[in-house]
């Protein structure tokens, strides 16, 4: 049993909770997720099973797309709807569509963002949420992120009321805290704010419409069709350039054999396949020997090569 499962993560579960539940359903210990989603966030969560856990790191650096909702009028400790109210300031004026769109434009491109206190970012060996739960405030590292697209989905021309909410879609780089973006939008508009809803609709090439629920996974297990839920390792890595080696080279790959970059591939990672179209390893450019490739992750062992 191996491959990538596109889980439609439900609300109220951590990514680790999802892994724990899948281990029980699939009766497989080698399971890992490809990037944390907050408990309140739903949507695309690629899960690697069996031998596919070796490729998890190559699926985490993908661009992500989310659809969510910002609420102006009060902020929270966690920057989302699960936290305690920190500041309240009723929206005492009409906010126009143009104002909101201009705020989104200023947050598009390469920007700096400070991670929230309630996050897993580590400072001095401790996670920020551990400091937050102890009531401690620490200096947080500013990170550079890229917002590829930030679009207002609400079709209203004006927004009014003591609290107002509007929907958005954002496509961003790995490491972006969308709830912090919601706070930044509020700052641009002059009001405390938080993220009131969020769903991840895409993680790289993996889309929400292709995801399945826990119930569907359990049904496939019961029906004996569990293999149908997996995206193969080869398919999951299809975005990377590919090299094919002969049988003799394939036997040496497990032992860390370097390869010549005969195809002059410039991409950072290269997948290496055998004549049977099975992915053997992922290679990268050798830092000291131009024109050579070195193994970054070997996906098979000698016993598997003889099968």
UniProtKB/Swiss-Prot annotation:
Gene name per UniProt: truB
Species in which this protein is naturally found: Bacillus cereus (strain ZK / E33L)
The protein's Enzyme Commission number: 5.4.99.25
Keyword Isomerase recorded: yes
Function noted in UniProt: Responsible for synthesis of pseudouridine from uracil-55 in the psi GC loop of transfer RNAs.
Catalytic activity: uridine(55) in tRNA = pseudouridine(55) in tRNA
Key words of the record: Isomerase, tRNA processing
GO biological process, one term: mRNA pseudouridine synthesis
Protein known as: tRNA pseudouridine synthase B
Record-stated family: Belongs to the pseudouridine synthase TruB family. Type 1 subfamily.
GO molecular function: RNA binding; tRNA pseudouridine(55) synthase activity
CDD domains listed in its UniProt record: PseudoU_synth_EcTruB
Record keyword Transcription present: no
């Amino acid at each position: 049993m191996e491959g990538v499962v596109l889980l439609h993560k439900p609300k109220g579960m951590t990514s680790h909770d999802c892994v724990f539940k899948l281990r029980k359903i699939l009766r497989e210990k080698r399971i890992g997720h490809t990037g944390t989603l907050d408990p309140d966030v739903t949507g695309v969560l690629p899960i690697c099973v069996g031998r596919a856990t070796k490729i998890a790191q190559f699926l985490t650096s993908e661009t992500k797309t989310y659809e969510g909702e910002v609420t102006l009028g009060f902020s929270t400790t966690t920057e989302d709807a699960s936290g305690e109210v920190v500041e309240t300031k009723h929206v005492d004026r009409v906010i126009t569509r143009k104002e909101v769109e201009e705020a989104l434009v200023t947050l598009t491109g390469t920007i700096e963002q400070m991670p929230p206190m309630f996050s897993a970012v580590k400072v001095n060996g401790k996670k920020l949420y551990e400091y937050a739960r102890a009531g401690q405030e620490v200096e947080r590292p500013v990170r550079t992120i890229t917002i590829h697209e930030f679009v207002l989905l609400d079709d209203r021309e004006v927004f009014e009321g003591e609290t107002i909410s509007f929907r958005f879609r954002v496509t961003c780089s790995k490491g972006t805290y969308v709830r912090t973006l919601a706070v930044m939008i509020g700052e641009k508009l002059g009001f405390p704010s938080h993220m009131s809803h969020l769903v991840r609709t895409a993680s790289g090439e993996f889309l929400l419409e292709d995801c399945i629920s826990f119930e569907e996974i359990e049904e496939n297990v019961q029906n004996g069709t569990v293999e149908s839920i997996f995206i193969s390792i080869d398919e999951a890595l299809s975005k990377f350039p590919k090299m094919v080696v002969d049988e003799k080279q394939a036997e040496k790959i497990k032992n860390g054999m370097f390869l010549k970059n005969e195809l002059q591939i410039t991409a950072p990672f290269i997948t290496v396949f055998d004549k049977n179209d099975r992915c053997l390893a992922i290679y990268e450019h050798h830092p000291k020997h131009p024109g050579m490739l070195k193994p970054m992750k070997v996906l098979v062992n000698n016993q598997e090569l003889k099968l």
